[in-house]
Amino acid sequence: MVLAVDLLNPSHESEMRKHKLKQLVQGPRSFFMDVKCPGCFNITTVFSHAQTVVICGSCASVLCQPTGGKARLMEGCSFRRKN
């Protein structure tokens, strides 16, 4: 009897669909990111699951607002994931 799915070598797509604790190698899904302010182009480091409103240090505009999970970036803000 041959299994249709290889349990020891799962595909990357199937691992990303699983819950973070049920993956073959457990790991967090949160990250830090550099967010660029659309008004003054100042870069601020923000946590992806921030629980408070993040404000730009120089022009005091709102960069992201918290939701139940990940923080929502405001319109016009661009981000880059940090390594």
From Swiss-Prot:
Gene3D superfamilies from the xrefs?
Answer: Zn-binding ribosomal proteins
Q: Which InterPro entries match?
A: Ribosomal_eS27, Ribosomal_eS27_Zn-bd_dom_sf, Ribosomal_zn-bd
What does the entry list under GO cellular component? cytosol; cytosolic small ribosomal subunit
Disulfide bond entries? none
Keyword entries, A-Z = Cytoplasm, Metal-binding, Ribonucleoprotein, Ribosomal protein, Zinc, Zinc-finger
Signal peptide interval: none
Q: Which cofactor does it need?
A: Zn(2+)
Q: How is the cofactor bound?
A: Binds 1 zinc ion per subunit.
What is one Gene Ontology biological process annotated in the Swiss-Prot or TrEMBL record?
A: ribosomal small subunit assembly
What is its subcellular localisation? Cytoplasm
> Which PANTHER family does UniProt cross-reference here?
40S RIBOSOMAL PROTEIN S27 (PTHR11594)
Q: State its role.
A: Component of the ribosome, a large ribonucleoprotein complex responsible for the synthesis of proteins in the cell. The small ribosomal subunit (SSU) binds messenger RNAs (mRNAs) and translates the encoded message by selecting cognate aminoacyl-transfer RNA (tRNA) molecules. The large subunit (LSU) contains the ribosomal catalytic site termed the peptidyl transferase center (PTC), which catalyzes the formation of peptide bonds, thereby polymerizing the amino acids delivered by tRNAs into a polypeptide chain.
Question: How does the record describe its quaternary structure?
Answer: Component of the small ribosomal subunit (SSU). Mature yeast ribosomes consist of a small (40S) and a large (60S) subunit. The 40S small subunit contains 1 molecule of ribosomal RNA (18S rRNA) and at least 33 different proteins. The large 60S subunit contains 3 rRNA molecules (25S, 5.8S and 5S rRNA) and at least 46 different proteins.
Q: What is this protein called?
A: Small ribosomal subunit protein eS27
Source organism of the structure:
Schizosaccharomyces pombe (strain 972 / ATCC 24843) (Fission yeast)
- Gene field: rps27
